[in-house]
């Protein structure tokens, strides 16, 4: 969302966060009864735009976040520490948590990482879809979300600088996000982390064999570490069709993935990741106001009301309150 808003500004066609044509805006968040929304400063290291600088991009998107928080203080407020979530909820405000999707924007500098924390960043992926100074990702040849071919990267994971970043992130209480990370990188995090970590937008590889998804072994390891996984609404990560154009994004498929997560790792690990404003295609739940559709699908899949509430907000609230 921050990336889309920044891009619109630079194109001379700014969008209002109050109401726009994106998956997420303030009106839709209110309609969806959101407790907390993570806002990712997204950086594409493959951007060939002349003069593109990953650090500048991240800082400009963080500036978009700051301006949103300043413009709508009665409706949404930032989260820097666990008490902020409770305070915002008590005041009837949505919590906005700043995250980074592409640790490479820090250019391998621990000093920049510390500055990101000071700016409010509380969760970060080590990579997006490009190798950087920190680690290697799981990527599909040619890009995109196509299921085939999709060979997980089991050879290269965290680099020396990546391990340094992990240690400093844990000291600062910036949550390590393993979505996009290679299989080897995931297991490096499992072995070396001392705090719970998240897979903010990943599904089950057993149901959709995409290398961006988690194997059952990974799900169990994440659960054993006290982690959180966010359901991803992207069709290529939900369906098991061999061609992306055939894949569907339906609430029924999301509920199937939730049921598998529950069976393998337990109900307490499941949250909502969405990847809204980072995915395209035909979505049954096509913006954040449509969450009741997913609640209904979960009930049809056999989830109790208590479990639906756990998935929708309690698990994420507990995870962030314990780990920020």
Feature roles, as predicted:
Residues 1, 180-183, 204, 278:
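Short, glycine/acidic-enriched loop or turn micro-motifs at the edges of active sites
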